[in-house]
């Protein structure tokens, strides 16, 4: 984004070049620099899970349906995809069905990814899962992946069988 230097106070002005360079590094790089700036100013940055751990889902099956063997295999494949994409800072989610990677989250986010599945639902294998987890090395204190009711509705509309999340890594 462009930054209008006339809107920046004198205390912040020296940080503009650093913030601009960080933004060019992608989400992970930018967030790490922002945390460094706050910590250098004397703030302690903590994740909401440290302050309100009850907001993180518990370990285990959170729905009425337990995953079958194929769901488990799909989740394992999806986890490997997220780990593989992590160094590229691409996304935090993917959809897998029958061991086939149907879609990966990119710049457009999870909603866009799921909309792309909904638009071509008949072209994909049936079933499958949405997998969501932090990227390897992701700064979890201020960038924790989230899933809400709208995501759940889209997963159903896309014809996926369920959602698998990384314990302690998704809200």
Regions inferred by a protein language model and the residue ranges of each:
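C-terminal binding/interaction regions
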Residues: 149-171
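Hydrophobic alpha-helical hairpins/lids featuring a short glycine-rich hinge
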Residues: 32-39
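Active-site gating loops and adjacent loop-to-helix segments of metal-dependent hydrolytic enzymes
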Residues: 8-18
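Short, basic, glycine/proline-bearing loop/turn elements
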Residues: 18-20, 132-138, 162-165
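Conserved mixed alpha/beta catalytic, RNA-binding, or beta-rich assembly cores of soluble enzyme
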Residues: 2-8, 24-28, 41, 46-153
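Short basic, glycine-rich beta-strand/loop surfaces that mediate nucleic-acid
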Residues: 5, 19, 169-171
């Amino acid at each position: 984004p462009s930054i209008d230097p006339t809107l920046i106070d004198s205390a912040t002005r020296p940080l503009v070049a650093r913030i601009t360079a960080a933004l060019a590094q992608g989400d992970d790089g930018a967030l790490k620099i922002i945390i460094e700036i706050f910590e250098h100013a004397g703030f302690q940055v903590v994740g909401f899970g440290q302050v309100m751990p009850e907001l993180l889902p518990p370990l285990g099956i959170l729905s009425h349906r337990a995953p079958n063997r194929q769901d488990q295999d799909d989740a394992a494949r999806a986890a490997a995809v997220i780990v593989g994409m992590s160094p590229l800072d691409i996304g935090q989610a993917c959809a897998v069905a029958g061991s086939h990677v149907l879609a990966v989250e990119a710049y457009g986010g999870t909603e866009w990814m799921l909309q792309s599945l909904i638009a071509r639902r008949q072209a994909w294998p049936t079933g499958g899962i949405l997998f969501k987890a932090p990227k390897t090395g992701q700064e979890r204190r201020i960038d924790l992946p989230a899933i809400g009711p709208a995501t759940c509705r889209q997963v159903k509309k896309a014809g996926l069988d369920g959602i698998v999340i990384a314990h302690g890594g998704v809200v």
